[in-house]
Amino acid sequence: MEVKTIMLLFQILAISTLKQGSAHVPDGYVEENVALRGRATQSAQLRGEHAALAHASNAIDGNRDSNYHHGSCTHTEGANPWWRVDLLQVYTIASVTITNRGDCCGERISGARILIGNSLENNGINNPQCSVIGSLATGETRTFHCPQPMIGRYVTVYLPKIESLQLCEVEVNALLPVN
């Protein structure tokens, strides 16, 4: 436990030297997609004919293919949907990269919030906000930088409206010390 605490303190020290809004990776650190190591879940999975293609884990499979029917995207149902990855440990997160669905419905993601923190209260929706997806073109991949690096275990994408949430890839870019 001591080693983890010391590493976390070094990460906090490193990020405290960053300017707010900076995308700079501090010396001695690298950015790595830690979502690949995590476990994904979502508010409700699409039902019906294409339900087998809609699993939450599809958004962290390392595949940016934006065609839903190729089996690498997730799809929710219901009002105010959310998708979440449990990173299984706490990381210092600089940004989140999202790949939007490309074969249709790209406008649905508009207004989604990217939330990062250590709480599962309200399914992670009460965690601090990293960014808001104002709009994202159909099939587009874009990186959303947090105003400053954030510390958290859970990354939630929450869509506060009556619409389905469809994500083809979610990459959580954490700052890791170079070994």
Swiss-Prot record:
Q: List the disulfide bonds.
A: C73-C168, C104-C105, C130-C146
- Presence of the UniProt keyword Calcium in the record: yes
Instruction: From the UniProt annotation, give the residues forming the signal peptide.
Output: 1-23
Give the GO biological process terms: regulation of cellular defense response; regulation of complement activation, lectin pathway; regulation of innate immune response
Output the SUPFAM superfamilies linked to this UniProt entry: Galactose-binding domain-like (SSF49785)
Q: Where does Ca(2+) bind?
A: N58, D61, N63, S72, C168, E169
Motif, Cell attachment site: chain positions: 101-103
Chief location: secreted
In residue numbers, the region (F5/8 type C-like) covers 31-179
Q: Which InterPro entries match?
A: BG_Antigen-Binding_Lectin, FTP1, Galactose-bd-like_sf
Q: Which GO-annotated molecular functions does the record name?
A: calcium ion binding; carbohydrate binding; fucose binding
Where does the UniProt annotation locate this protein? Secreted
- A Pfam family cross-referenced in the UniProt record is F5_F8_type_C_2
Which Gene Ontology cellular component terms are annotated?
extracellular space
- Record keywords, A-Z: Calcium, Disulfide bond, Lectin, Metal-binding, Secreted, Signal
For the keyword Signal, the answer is yes
Provide the binding site for alpha-L-fucose: H75, R101, R108
**Miscellaneous section:** Binds 1 calcium ion per monomer.
What is the role of the protein in this entry? Acts as a defensive agent. Recognizes blood group fucosylated oligosaccharides including A, B, H and Lewis B-type antigens. Does not recognize Lewis A antigen and has low affinity for monovalent haptens.
The UniProt entry, under PANTHER family, shows: FTP DOMAIN-CONTAINING PROTEIN (PTHR45713), SI:CH211-215K15.4 (PTHR45713:SF8)
| UniProt similarity note | Belongs to the fucolectin family.
- Describe the subunit structure: Homotrimer.
Q: What is this protein's name?
A: Fucolectin-4
Show the taxonomic lineage.
Answer: Eukaryota, Metazoa, Chordata, Craniata, Vertebrata
